[in-house]
């Protein structure tokens, strides 16, 4: 929208800064801007870049910026951070994971996008994109499906098996009909089989069960960033239990048996949930234990197509220092 950027080009400082960014020459800083002016400036400076990353200091502020910047770019998405405290579950559960997976899908598909995130989310080590790509399932009308094998694959991908699909992250298999509610989609998919061959694929409304659209092919993205085989799951829990035992012993030696009992109980509940129901929501913040090859979020962008914008550089810098000192994230 040139009508929005035209006033900016009348500023010599903007023109100079834009030229430097376009050539990839160093960093540009602007001060004395109000919040609305900052977003206007970001919009102008980001012209020509297909991946725009706006970094702020908190999830609350990220959501505010995401809502405001949607005026400039409808492709704006918020990438929320995960809880940094070891063993603690994501309080937002599936909704938070869904937001993150939608952003990762946009990056995998190399779509133009503006991502609003926080310093902690940017630095958080997680499963590399290659690990997510290898788990994406593709179906078309030439596909054949082993229902038992597919069920095991979907559980590893973080999906929950249920009698009937009602919300994102669930799947059901019954009588040659496979329903999967992809975490990145608005409507679930229904795959109908003839024997083990795909006969039809369609999306449907979860409430009315009526068809929305007939499809030739679909891709099913993981419902979690933490996809674990049984062997990796067992190895991770063995390491957690060993560390928990040492920590509980230390707490009891310090005269705090109640805290020791709480941590042991919490770990036991998380393990039982993962074993019995295939739930990995409570394991997301323990990625560092289960995934040995990790990558920070900032590595997921294409270098020549990306541009970072720090909405409060001094606060973000202090946040980065805090994260490095307390959690060892570079």
Question: What are the functions of these language-model segments?
Answer:
Residues 1-330:
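ASCE RecA-like P-loop NTPase motor cores
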